[in-house]
């Protein structure tokens, strides 16, 4: 009886909030003030070797990628184009490269960190698909990119068909170290070439207790977002197989109500998505189904900022002939439907280009605020699943936000660091939790005392 009472008391104390975070508990990353952005000169960071044949995206039998998909319809692009088509914007696609063609004619060469090409090649098909979502040209069918008047900058930063010639140590950490170094250089290069929207749809995931040095990456991200005023959009990550080239990530626990001071549950993170976790400089994008619900594979995390369509996508093939595609070949060369946060990020980057074109006076932080403030909110507060809510292109282009009395058309303001949200006043909730904890402890102690008293009164057997 006494043991049961104290066991109940111990459980009550844990539930009441006396919780010790794991040794690897993390928080939002902090940019090292002493770190310098790396050189953005393209070129392989390590000698690479092609290990597999190139993949070409195609059309799944019995389907027509020219028919507007539910994902495209969800954004109501014809209505959005009444206000902006992305004129005057340069969007960098840091991915597997982009193959120009009739549906992607406005692509600038941004260089290659895999081989020594100009970046206008795509051995995986992924980068071209993302580019088509951002700025693919309309044709005699129902497909169009979000911002068809924008220009694209192709920077080839990775390929699943290539790997380092030599590797040593832990292969996961070695690959992650290489990926982080390449991404840092690619982001600096994109910013230096004038991209005002930078899309990163290839991500790296690591366990929270097995991280690699990201000082240079943090400096590069801050340099692009603050010094160069670029909106950086990144895929949140996928927790299962999908039509994407990024490796599968592990999921994260959602909000823990026992820790009211950590509403986004940074302390509970077990898997980190790079570069998405670099808050507040990166807008991380989760995936939605065609019905507007969170995709099952979309990786949750405290960095998720917004959600966009990411399932059963259609876009432009890397075949080079302007054909559309809705599938990528799997390991058995069977075409698999295109789904992933990679493509969701492309939709957000496209809308960011529309907003920057319509409101040239907004800096990068204000553009991100406009995207998140006009999203369809699934909850009153940002969640680890969909962030601020579902992307709304028309609202982002038309709503007048309280802080923008002039509709955002004022002259550009000096760019400052994105503000870190002020700590929420959780005093009332903390008091409630403390009161509940104290009451629970009192009840537990009373139960234990009563049990001891009864034990003393009972005859000894």
Curated annotation (Swiss-Prot):
It is a single-pass membrane protein. Induction: Constitutively expressed during growth in culture. SUPFAM superfamilies: Subtilisin-like. Its main location: membrane. One of its GO terms (molecular function) is serine-type endopeptidase activity. Residues 1-25 form the signal peptide. Its EC number is 3.4.21.-. The active site is at residues 95, 126, 342. Residues 64-397 form the Peptidase S8 domain. This is Mycosin-3. It comes from Mycobacterium tuberculosis (strain ATCC 25618 / H37Rv).
């Amino acid at each position: 009886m006494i043991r049961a009472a104290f066991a109940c008391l111990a459980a009550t104390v844990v539930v009441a909030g006396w919780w010790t975070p794991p040794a690897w508990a993390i928080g939002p990353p902090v940019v090292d003030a002493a770190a310098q952005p790396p050189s953005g000169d393209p070129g392989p960071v390590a000698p690479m070797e092609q290990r597999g044949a190139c993949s070409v995206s195609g059309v799944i039998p019995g389907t027509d990628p020219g028919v507007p998909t539910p994902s495209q319809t969800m954004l109501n692009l014809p209505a959005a184009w009444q206000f902006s088509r992305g004129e005057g914007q340069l969007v960098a696609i840091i991915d597997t490269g982009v193959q120009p063609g009739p549906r992607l004619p406005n692509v600038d060469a941004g260089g290659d960190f895999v081989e020594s090409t100009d970046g206008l090649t795509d051995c995986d098909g992924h980068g071209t698909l993302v580019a088509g979502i951002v700025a693919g040209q309309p044709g005699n069918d129902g497909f169009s990119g979000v911002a068809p008047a924008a220009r694209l900058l192709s920077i080839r930063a990775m390929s699943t068909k290539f790997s380092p010639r030599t590797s040593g140590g832990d292969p996961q950490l070695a690959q992650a170290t290489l990926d982080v170094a390449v991404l840092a250089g690619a982001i600096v290069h994109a910013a230096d070439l004038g991209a005002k929207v930078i899309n990163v749809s290839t991500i790296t995931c690591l366990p929270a207790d097995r991280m690699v040095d990201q000082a240079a990456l943090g400096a590069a991200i801050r340099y692009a977002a603050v010094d160069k005023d670029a909106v950086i959009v990144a895929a949140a990550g996928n927790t299962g197989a999908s039509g994407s080239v990024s490796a599968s990530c592990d999921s994260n626990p959602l909000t823990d109500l026992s820790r009211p001071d950590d509403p986004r549950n940074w302390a509970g993170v077990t898997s980190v998505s790079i570069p998405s976790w670099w808050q507040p400089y990166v807008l991380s994008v989760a995936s939605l189904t065609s019905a507007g619900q969170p995709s099952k594979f979309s990786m949750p995390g405290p960095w998720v900022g917004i959600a966009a369509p990411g399932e059963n996508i259609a876009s432009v093939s890397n075949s080079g002939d302007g054909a559309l595609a809705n599938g990528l070949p799997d390991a058995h060369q069977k075409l698999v439907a295109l789904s992933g946060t990679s493509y969701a990020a492309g939709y957000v980057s496209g809308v960011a280009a529309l907003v920057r074109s319509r409101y040239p006076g907004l800096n990068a932080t204000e553009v991100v605020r406009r995207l998140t403030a006009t999203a369809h909110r699934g909850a009153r507060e940002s969640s680890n699943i969909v962030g601020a809510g579902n992307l709304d292109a028309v609202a982002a282009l038309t709503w007048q936000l309280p802080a923008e009395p002039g509709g955002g058309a004022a002259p550009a303001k000096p760019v400052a660091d994105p503000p870190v949200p002020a700590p929420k006043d959780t005093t009332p909730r903390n008091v409630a939790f403390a009161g509940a904890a104290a009451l629970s402890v009192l009840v537990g102690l009373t139960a234990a005392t009563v049990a001891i008293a009864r034990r003393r009164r009972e005859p000894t057997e």
